[in-house]
């Protein structure tokens, strides 16, 4: 299960799960700035890392993104952990693309 980095109030009426792009982690300058700005509006922002980025953090070695299947499974794990009732998902670049793909899959599943 991914580790979360959370900005904004736990009691917020809406939570945004925000995924990083292919080349930078969840705590990059861009992600910090965007998450902080969104949290200032009263939205809870929850960031996480895909497995390859977590491994990069632990080993210091760059590696390519995981296969699409793993990225989508990670998104499903995040959604299950956070609950979907008041959850919006998105991300930067690759993270946003995976968010839109998993959203389409979940919608088709009902």
Feature names for model-found ranges:
Residues 1-87, 101-105:
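Serine-hydrolase catalytic machinery in alpha/beta-hydrolase-like enzymes
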Residues 108-110:
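A conserved short beta-strand
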């Amino acid at each position: 299960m991914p580790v979360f980095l959370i900005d904004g109030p736990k009691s917020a009426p809406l939570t945004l799960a925000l995924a990083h792009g292919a080349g930078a982690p969840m705590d990059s300058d861009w992600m910090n700035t965007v998450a902080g700005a969104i949290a200032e509006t009263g939205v809870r922002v929850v960031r996480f890392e895909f497995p390859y980025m977590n491994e990069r953090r632990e080993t210091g070695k760059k590696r390519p993104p995981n296969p699409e299947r793993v990225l989508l499974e990670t998104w499903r794990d995040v959604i299950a952990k956070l609950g979907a009732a008041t959850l919006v998902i998105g991300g930067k670049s690759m993270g946003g693309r995976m968010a839109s793909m998993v959203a389409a899959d979940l919608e088709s599943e009902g």
